[in-house]
Structures are given as C-alpha cells and as structure tokens.
C-alpha cells in the first residue's frame, strides 16, 4: 500500500466501455442484494421488543435542568447521540470520531416530519461542551448527562463510549427501542459512504485494496490532521474560537 501523499499511486486496469459496464453490472447485482438485506435488517429493528427507561432521568440543557422526557420536545421518538467528552481538555483533544459524525448531522426537518427528535447527550459538563458545540457551529439540541444519569441511560453498556440510542414516548412513559456503538454510528455519516464509491475508498490500512493503493501514513489517526480533528480546521480558518473556557483545568493527558 502506498502513502496517501505519494505521486506513484496504483491504478486499475484500463479497459473498453463494454468490459467496464459488464464488470459494473455484475457488481450491481451484489449492491442490490446488499440494499435488500439492509431493508430486511431495518424491518427486524421494527419488530424488536422494547424496554422501559426512566423518563425523569435528569439532563442539563440550554435552559438548565430538564428530563429525558423533555428532550423529546413533544415528539413521539427521540434519537440521542452520546458524545464522548474529555473534561478539562482543549478542543483539539476532544473526540475526533464524535466530532466527525456529529458534524454530518445538519438538516433535521425530515426527521421532525416523521415525529423524531434528534439530540446530542454529551458525557461531560454542559457549559464546557456547549462551547464546543458553538465552536463547531452545530445547531441540534444539546444536553449534558452526568455520571448518575449515564448509569441509568447506558445501563449494561460502557459509559464514555459513543452510542446511538433510540427511544419511544407513549404519554409520560419512555422506552428504549434500539442502540448501537462503534461502527454502528456510521449511520450518521455520509463522507465515508461517498468515499466507499471511489476507486481508492477510505484510504485506510484495514481495507482490502490492491497493492499500490494509497492509505494514510502508519500511526496517523484517520480522523485527525495537524494535531486536531480534521473537521475543526474549517471552523478555525473561518475565525471561530475554540476556547472552551477550561484552560485552568488543563493537565497533560497520555495518548494511547
């Protein structure tokens, strides 16, 4: 595999149009089967049983103390993204994955038309993390969940990790209907979906690619460049401040 910055990158075999189309048609059969299987899996989610969650679980929002039930904003369903947070650390050291995926959730009107609210539940202090939201220009509802609330909301799961959790409201009763983590949160992503359509793909070492295909340098995080999350750079270049107001708390943090 080649370094992504190399001028000597591999390239596929050049063929005539009919040969190209024949290969693409064969792949399309697999793509359509994949799409149909995705529909079947989505249907299975709709048949899952549900579990009761305490709707009075406290959160902190823009106007202060609220509850999980309040986060529905009157709608029947809620999708909550649980954002990883490094308390007391600067913006450059906040979670690059959560930052990447959250940056791709912008237009919520279609969700709202289906009676779904989308919100971020940050696993850190509200004031500090809300500054980060403002720096990144995000407009979705933003809440902070303290450790006690997280024990309730993420029972049986690893607190501090990224999660998507889906909820249903029936009157004042709240139920959890689905959750996922790790690569499951790619449901929020469109950049990787587009990269997957290109000849060089995601350009990451784990991919099955021909010899000579580019990849990011060994040891370089795929979501970071220049010492911070990639998607922070346009905000800085546009003049937005990344000051989270927590510099007095800063201390060295070991990178693993």
Question: PLM features: residue spans?
Answer:
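Non-globular targeting/processing and membrane-anchoring segments
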Residues: 1-114, 131-137, 141, 148-256
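Catalytic nucleophile loop
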Residues: 113-129
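Short loop/edge segments at beta-strand edges and connector loops
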Residues: 122-123, 144-146
């Amino acid at each position: 595999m080649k370094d992504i910055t190399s001028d000597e990158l591999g390239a596929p075999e050049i063929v005539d149009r009919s040969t190209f189309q024949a290969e693409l048609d064969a792949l399309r059969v697999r793509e359509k089967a994949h799409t149909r299987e995705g529909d079947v899996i989505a249907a299975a989610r709709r048949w899952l049983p549900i579990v009761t969650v305490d709707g009075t679980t406290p959160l902190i929002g823009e106007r202060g103390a609220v509850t999980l039930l309040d986060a529905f904003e009157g709608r029947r369903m809620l999708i909550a993204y649980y954002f990883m947070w490094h308390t007391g650390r600067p913006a450059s050291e906040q979670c690059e994955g959560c930052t990447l995926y959250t940056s791709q959730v912008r237009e919520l009107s279609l969700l709202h038309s289906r009676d779904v609210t989308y919100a971020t539940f940050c696993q850190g202090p509200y004031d500090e993390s809300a500054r980060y939201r403002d720096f990144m220009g995000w407009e979705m509802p933003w809440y902070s969940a303290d450790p006690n609330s997280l024990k309730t909301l993420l029972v049986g799961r690893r607190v501090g990790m990224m999660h998507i959790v889906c909820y249903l409201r029936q009157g004042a009763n709240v139920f959890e209907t689905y959750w996922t983590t790790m690569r499951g949160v790619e449901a929020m992503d469109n950049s990787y979906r587009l990269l997957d359509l290109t000849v060089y793909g995601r350009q990451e070492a784990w991919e099955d690619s021909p010899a000579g295909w580019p990849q990011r340098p060994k040891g370089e995080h795929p979501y970071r460049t220049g010492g911070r999350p990639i998607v922070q750079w346009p905000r800085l270049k546009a003049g937005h401040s990344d000051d989270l107001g927590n510099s007095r708390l800063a201390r060295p943090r070991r990178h693993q």
